[in-house]
Design a protein with these regions (language model features):
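Ferredoxin-type iron-sulfur electron-transfer modules and their immediate structural context
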Residues: 1-154
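N-terminal Rossmann-like FAD-binding beta1-loop-alpha1 element of flavoenzymes
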Residues: 153-167
Length: 167
């Protein structure tokens, strides 16, 4: 997984948020992506820990730890490090049908649970996830899937979480 010495060689890097006054004039992302080389370095920081708590999605002493939808984070970090973006998307879609939504609203408990976070700064998992799905849309790997036929039926959706978005 990743580069065995990646967590030693590379520091945690996160994109710099756009200034609020700059964001007022448009609907563009306020968390821009790192360039590909730097994203791959962040993927290399994933250290193939023995027990990757980042994707456990467990409650420990009543507190959430790791990814609540059990994304296989070390695997797609490794694929990004190796430049295998399409495969990283496939791995991400194994557990998450809506990374373009959930990845943006998630508070990233995976980063808090990252084993590297014990003695150093955690891997920038959230920024890697954003880059995977945004690249997938840009490359045409993800396309809208409208219903094949209209049934004429109506559905009431309660809530705006992942289940509501899937309805």
């Amino acid at each position: 997984m990743g580069k065995p010495t990646g967590f030693i060689e590379y520091l945690r890097e996160l994109p710099v948020d756009r200034a609020p006054l700059q964001r007022l004039g448009d609907w563009k992302e306020f968390h821009p992506h790192l360039e590909e080389k730097r994203l791959r370095q962040q993927g290399a920081r994933c250290m193939d820990c023995g027990v990757p708590f980042c994707h456990t999605g467990k409650l420990i002493s009543g507190m959430a730890s790791g990814c609540p939808i059990h994304n296989v984070i070390p695997e797609w970090n490794d694929l990004v490090y190796r430049g295998l973006w399409r495969e990283a998307l496939d791995r991400l879609h194994m557990t998450n049908n809506f990374p373009e939504f959930t990845g943006r609203v998630c508070p990233a408990p995976c980063e808090a649970a990252c084993t590297l976070n014990v003695n150093d700064d955690a891997v920038g998992i959230k920024s890697i996830e954003h880059a995977i799905i945004d690249r997938a849309w840009a490359e045409g790997w993800v396309t809208p899937q409208p219903p094949r036929t209209q049934t004429g039926r109506k559905v009431a959706v309660v809530g705006s979480g992942p289940a509501g978005l899937a309805a």
